[in-house]
Amino acid sequence: TVKDATGAVTAVTAEDFNQGIINSPEQLIQGKTAGVQISQSSGEPGAGIDIRIRGANSVRSNNNPLFVVDGIPLSGGNTTAEGQNIGVGTNSAKNPLSFINPNDIESISILKDASATAIYGSRGANGVVFITTKSGKGGRGGSWDFSSNLSIATVAKTFDLLNAEDYLEQSDFFGFNVAERNFGNSTDWQDYIFRTSASTNNNIAYSNNYGTGNVRATFSYGKNFGVVENTSLERITGRLNANQRLLNDKLKLGLQATISRVNDEVAPTGASAGFRGDLLGSAYSANPTWPTSPNFDGTGGLLSPATALAYTQNTSFTDRYLVNFSAEYNFISELSAKVNVGYDNSTSSRTALATKKARNFDQGAFGNGLGAINDLDTESKLLEVTLNYNKEFSNSSLDVLAGYSFQDFTRSGRNVSGFGFFADEFNEMGRDLEYVASEVESRIQGDYQQYGYAPNISDGIFVNRLFPEPATDFIPNLNSGLVRSLFVDTFDNTDELQSYFGRVNYSIADKYLFTATMRADGSTRFGKNNEYGYFPSGAFAWKIHNEDFVGDSVSTLKLRLGVGITGNQEGLGYGNYTQRERYAGGDVISDGGDINIPGTVILSFPNPDLKWEETLQYAAGIDFGFNNDRLNGSLDVYRKETTDLLFNVLSAQPATQPFQFQNLPGSKVVNEGIELAIGYDIIDTEDFNWNTNFNIAYNKNLVEELDGEFNAGTIRGQGLSLAFAQKLKAGQPLFSYFLREFEGFDPVTGQPIQNDIQEFVGKSALPELTGGLSTSWSYKDLTLSAYFAGQFGHYIYNNTANAFFTAGAFRGGRNVPLDVLQTGESFDAAADVSTRFLEKGDFVRLQNVTLSYNWPMPEDAFFSSLMLSVTGQNLFVITDYTGLDPEVSSSPGGDDLLNGLPVFGIDYAAYPRPRTFTLGLNAKF
């Protein structure tokens, strides 16, 4: 339990979860725990979420923690296929946890320090989030739970752009040809792509506890429509939890099974969109006198939002199955053994299409049509065996755990690209592309990596094979006439993780608690000389409140000390310690439909010494409570040192190999911080209760040692090719901004006054302070609760303004806010990457307010309980940031990351965060 823990562990139960529209489990606990930063990358339904527990450790991985669902460690990778570029950039993958129905969750525990996470060894460096689902409850005959809600969402904020009249007036004022700019309409393009959306979520559950066992079965259906046209997320889930005791309770059997289907619809948006922008960027910059006809061709090469909406479609489905079976046998009262078998499987396919009417799209879409199918299959199998010895002595207790686990992770799939479609209707285009790819595949004999055809390839369909030696051969062409050019790239990777672990807990007089943990992990991701890593930890806790010298008013007072080593293997990829060769992929089809048959490339070179990143953490904390914990809290301090950073390093030339995955020698990232959490039951009477909880955390991040410098943070926009805003270097925090210092505009020339070179500006995208405040008032059966969240000390690079809101953009015919034209900027000034677009990201948000009424029920009523609730989310935000929302970070696809480094703190036309109101009904019978 948390009270007996020697490490930093926080548990949040269902009654304290956030309410409203919840697409994934992380949102349930956002802001509830000190030192845990949870940020949704955008307001899009199912968008990815970044979680940082006690700072960011790694320079390559996403720094998210390990998620464990009912004892099954999840793979950590994406389970929804990323989208390919069909002319507006690539789509990032969605949240892999969206398959879990939040209503099925009983509690979420967060393991923060090394003494708590070391039992997970090489996967615990970023912390561990343990999700426990609900089990069967209720008496004879069982009970039913039903919940349903309806939500209405609107865009919380829009840009204050020029309307048609003002646009023409400003054009005339600055001497532009108004006749060429006036197309006779008055269009609010933000209003055109945004909408008021309605969403629903419905759950029904049967629960029964029949003495020797229990069962809980649930079914849920939810449909969340986004506030941007053509965006939605549909989730259908079923879950079964069953437990049975046999042989006089010596044998315990458990089964947890989830099946889900998530259907996703995405608008033509992409964090890697070109200078024209995507749907959002085009709506922010489109001429307000353009008509809303999707066939309008007077844009001067710019993208019309009407065209983007009408002639693109991007949909996906993800089927996922998560099953865990356990058997535990008690040989004697002190000794038990447990076997845990887990299986996690997902099948995902995304189809993105742009018809031949998609004017001003990249990659030759207009007049031809583009299509892409991305298939991703993941599978993970787990076998875990543990032996537990628990012995109570006269004045002490001993708990010993020893175990073995084996888990494999397989990822396979294909990426299909099509160019030049005969059809011009979405469903028909998708069917034709799937048919052509499958028909060609059925004709290929033997193993292959790639295949395709194009008009410029006269020998037929090329097939690239890797085994037994890389070779290209040809088979007869398909000649279907349905798709002019086709390219298919396949992949199939498997990783294995084998582990031995042990833990000893020893307690003396329920006052002095000792914990020692050791785990040895062996992974196929690393070199032969370092297949195994060893991760020890130790911790001590002193329950001071059990000492005789402590007064009765002190209900909890516990000192905790811990030290340990954990590891990280994420962000590395597959087989990168060996020399691995494959055929090049990417955008192989040219804008004209030709294909240059790809040749082989070396993806990695031998490095038998490649090993885990290691994080050494020291932590100390104190838990306190007074008057039966009416006032309670905790104070923690920590230092985390991550070394042996994994990186793809270019070799000094001349060299036999141009690059190699290495553990950077002497590399070290340090996080130091302090966390405070306080809860207080201010009023606690029979009829009226008022409680509040507050948490705040400070974290300082620094790259103390690093050999070399690495550019990061790609910036998008016209004239910004190869531009970047961040750099990784020793002496700076992660995600540090590297910019020109901007001091204004020359009053004579209107040119920017700024440095000629980029340099560190002493600012980072990582917040130094995070905090949350929740409070709840209840009077009899009426309850009102509110939750505030805040982040401070960080900066956001406003790439949206850099790309679209400049005087030069207005000269090019784009719309802008009025204040852009009042800065004195010359219309021919270059919009360089500079501190002009760097803004403070501090904010305080009223994230959640819920008013609920628990209807009193007579004993003979059909319903045992009935509750009605109204919830408002994202009601207001206090910030100086001029973008749509300060809690944002663009997430381009993995292939678009500069130097393979993750992006954080850069806002490029991110999907706006909605303001939502939800009416809910919960009934038990």
What are these regions (language model features)?
Residues V849-I878, P892-G893:
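C-terminal structured "cap/appendage" subdomains that terminate the fold
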Residues T1-L240, R245-L246, L251-S260, L322, ...:
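Short, small/polar-rich motifs associated with maturation and membrane association
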Residues A765-Y797:
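Glycine-rich, aromatic-lined ligand/substrate-binding cores of catalytic
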Residues T133, N163, I204-N208, L240-Q244, ...:
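Residues on the lipid-exposed face of transmembrane beta-strands in outer-membrane beta-barrel proteins
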Residues L233-R245, E531-A541, L866-V877:
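Short secondary-structure subsegments characteristic of cysteine-rich extracellular domains
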Residues S148, F219-K223, F514-F526, V563, ...:
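Transmembrane beta-strand segments that form the barrel wall of outer-membrane beta-barrel proteins
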Residues A5, N63-N64, V69, S75, ...:
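Surface-exposed loop/interface segments of Gram-negative outer-membrane beta-barrel transport/assembly proteins
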Residues I105, G238-L240, V339, Q498-V504, ...:
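Extended, hydrophobic alpha-helical segments in both membrane/secreted and soluble proteins
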